[in-house]
Amino acid sequence: IAMIKKSLLLIVFLVIGCNNPSSKNQKVIPNSSGNINTISVVMPEKAWRGTLGNKVRDLFQTPYEGLPFDEPQFSLKYLNPKVFSGFARQSRNILWFVKDSLSQFQMLQDAFARPQIVALFKGNDDDEQAFYLEENTSLIKQSITENERIEKLRRISKAPTTETNLKKRFGISLRYPTAYKTVKDTTNFIWIQKPTTTGHLN
């Protein structure tokens, strides 16, 4: 009888364990990756070299206003749909163009990684997809800009600067990454700059 009770008790534990949601294998969403202000663009190569690709470049690589030199708002990274799998899907910002009889636009959050913005354009041809792109450019830019702002703050919090020049000289507390260095320090002027070899910060 004791053995029977032990067996029944073991079965009860097994049943409870199997029905416990926390014990089931849950999908693990990886961390997103990519440089700041970089967007992965997924479409057929012919479309990328044609009108649709030009439309994406015109809308998302417009220069910032007020700078003495042209710096695009976003850097674009082209991906062929054939390689859009695995690690390639972990980009933080994605424009995904798909040929489909059901024409629609969708904004997906954390679809393949976290944090992530995926703008999905479906249409019978490039013209339909370009229409949805133009209609939603403002929303997409706002979403990506906010996504990048959060990512910048996360990176700053991981490696904040230890320089105290601003605090000592002007009583100003400013948090910025260690990648930025003081390159000029005078009586009433401090110049902080991030060294770059690409001509822009994207």
Q: Where are the language model's segments positioned?
A:
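N-terminal targeting sequences that direct proteins away from the cytosol to non-cytosolic compartments
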Residues: 19-201
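Sec-dependent signal peptide recognition
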Residues: 4-11
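C-terminal motif of bacterial Sec signal peptides marking the signal peptidase cleavage site
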Residues: 15-17
